[in-house]
Amino acid sequence: MTDLKASSLRALKLMDLTTLNDDDTDEKVIALCHQAKTPVGNTAAICIYPRFIPIARKTLKEQGTPEIRIATVTNFPHGNDDIEIALAETRAAIAYGADEVDVVFPYRALMAGNEQVGFDLVKACKEACAAANVMLKVIIETGELKDEALIRKASEISIKAGADFIKTSTGKVAVNATPESARIMMEVIRDMGVEKTVGFKPAGGVRTAEDAQKYLAIADELFGADWADARHYRFGASSLLASLLKALGHGDGKSASSY
């Protein structure tokens, strides 16, 4: 197996196969569930809006892949600093049956100098998730923070508040995941000594098998080749799947989605 094939198979099994579009329908989510079951293995999860969780759960069960996890988003994509609304959305997502919640950190508040509200928001959402055995990923929106010190600070605050994962981006702004921001965030995980309990998720802009290989290489360099498993590493993507399957000898590499 070539290096690209090996990394593509790894990446496929770490994907949160995503559709977060305004025109999403039951039919599109059902199709996403079908795509998550591939000839070379399943993606780790799908990521969808909360209202589609019941139809996704039913579809995954019917197609014989109930182990594919269902992730959803809250405080999304705006990252407002209203803790009560973020918490209410997170509780609603849990009630719908989410296995994982990706909440947007109030990054604009941090840019304005307020570190406390981000901590409090993540902590409140974590408490709700922990009570239901739901994993919490925190989206810090690196492409808006831009500054390395702010990316580090948002990562640190999220981890201290209980994040199970830190995630780069919503996929809804001009700049999403970059290898540079990925390295900064994973260095925070390393420097805080939390690599056993905290994972990393690049999202938005990871589109090709070669892209995924680059991101995995950073993780391997920092933590060794065994760290990036589904508990510690995910790719938030949609069009990436077609490229990975093509690298693995399945399909033509074309995809209808751009996330």
From Swiss-Prot:
Top-level lineage group: Bacteria
Instruction: Please give the GO cellular component terms listed in this UniProt entry.
Output: cytoplasm
E.C. no = 4.1.2.4
User: Which InterPro entries does the entry mention?
Assistant: Aldolase_TIM (IPR013785), DeoC (IPR011343), DeoC/FbaB/LacD_aldolase (IPR002915), DeoC_typeII (IPR023649)
Keyword set for this entry?
Answer: Cytoplasm, Lyase, Schiff base
Group of enzyme by EC: lyase
* Record-level GO BP terms: 2-deoxyribose 1-phosphate catabolic process; carbohydrate catabolic process; deoxyribonucleotide catabolic process
Catalytic residues (positions): D102, K167, K201
Give the matching CDD domains.
DeoC (cd00959)
* Location within or outside the cell: Cytoplasm
**Principal cellular location given in the protein's record:** cytoplasm
What S-S linkages are listed for this chain?
none
Q: Which GO terms describe its molecular function?
A: deoxyribose-phosphate aldolase activity
Q: Give me the reactions it catalyses.
A: 2-deoxy-D-ribose 5-phosphate = D-glyceraldehyde 3-phosphate + acetaldehyde
The record ties this protein, via Pfam families, to: DeoC
Pathway participation: Carbohydrate degradation; 2-deoxy-D-ribose 1-phosphate degradation; D-glyceraldehyde 3-phosphate and acetaldehyde from 2-deoxy-alpha-D-ribose 1-phosphate: step 2/2
Q: What does this protein do?
A: Catalyzes a reversible aldol reaction between acetaldehyde and D-glyceraldehyde 3-phosphate to generate 2-deoxy-D-ribose 5-phosphate.
Describe the family membership recorded for this protein in Swiss-Prot or TrEMBL: Belongs to the DeoC/FbaB aldolase family. DeoC type 2 subfamily.
What protein am I looking at? Deoxyribose-phosphate aldolase
Q: Which organism is it from?
A: Escherichia coli O8 (strain IAI1)
Identify the coding gene. deoC
